[in-house]
Structures are given as structure tokens and as C-alpha cells.
């Protein structure tokens, strides 16, 4: 198992965004996390959920603290991941969610 977080790609971002993370059209992508991560490190993974399915994972390249949410003014961390990531051939049902959740990668196939 490989430690990381799960992030849901909003439906408003569309299938095109979900595909771009894994098809080679991007070299990196930015996710946001409220506050400062207590357990997350460079080299861990962001597991992506789209339309209530775990579709893949991307390795974390950098954690950039000190950003501010423009809507709330609260601190957040930018999570830069390497793309393309590893896409599952057969997505796994996984309920989408708001925010960030830590995971041991238990849903990732061995």
C-alpha cells in the first residue's frame, strides 16, 4: 500500500480534466489542501476520484505551504503532482467527497 490522500475531481472540471491527468498532455497538476498537511510528504500519492470512481493516482512532486484561499482567506497548501499518473484500467467504485482524506492506498490493486 502507498500512503497519500484522495481528492475528488469536480464534475464541473469535466472528463477532459480527468483524462488530461493520465494521457500525457500535462506534465504536472495543482491540487489544494486546507491548512498544512501533517502526514503528507513528497513522494506520496494523490488518488483521484471522478464520478464516484477511483480512476488513478499521481505522485506528489512538491508541497507548497503559505498559499491563501481567495474566497475564505484561510491558509492552504498547494500540492503539485507529476503527470501523467497511473490510470486504472478498470476504475473502482469510490464515493467522491469534498476536501482531502488521508489513505493508505488500500483501494489500489496490488
Region locations from a protein language model:
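Short, well-ordered beta-strand micro-motif
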Residues: 59, 80-82
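Short beta-strand-centered aromatic/proline hotspots
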Residues: 55-66
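Short conserved beta-strand and strand-loop elements enriched in small hydrophobics
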Residues: 44-49
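Short, solvent-exposed secondary-structure boundary/capping segments
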Residues: 64-80
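Compositionally biased, charged N-terminal/linker segments
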Residues: 1-42, 75-77, 85-110
Amino acid at each position: 500500500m502507498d500512503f497519500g490522500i484522495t481528492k475528488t475531481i469536480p464534475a464541473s472540471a469535466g472528463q477532459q480534466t480527468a483524462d488530461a491527468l493520465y494521457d500525457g498532455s500535462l506534465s504536472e497538476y495543482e491540487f489544494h489542501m486546507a491548512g498544512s498537511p501533517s502526514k503528507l510528504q513528497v513522494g506520496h500519492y494523490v488518488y483521484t476520484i471522478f464520478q464516484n470512481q477511483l480512476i488513478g493516482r499521481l505522485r506528489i512532486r512538491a508541497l507548497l505551504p503559505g498559499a491563501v484561499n481567495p474566497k475564505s482567506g484561510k491558509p492552504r497548501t498547494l500540492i503539485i503532482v507529476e503527470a501523467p499518473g497511473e490510470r486504472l484500467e478498470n476504475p473502482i467504485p469510490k464515493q467522491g467527497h469534498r476536501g482531502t482524506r488521508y489513505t493508505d492506498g488500500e483501494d489500489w490493486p496490488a
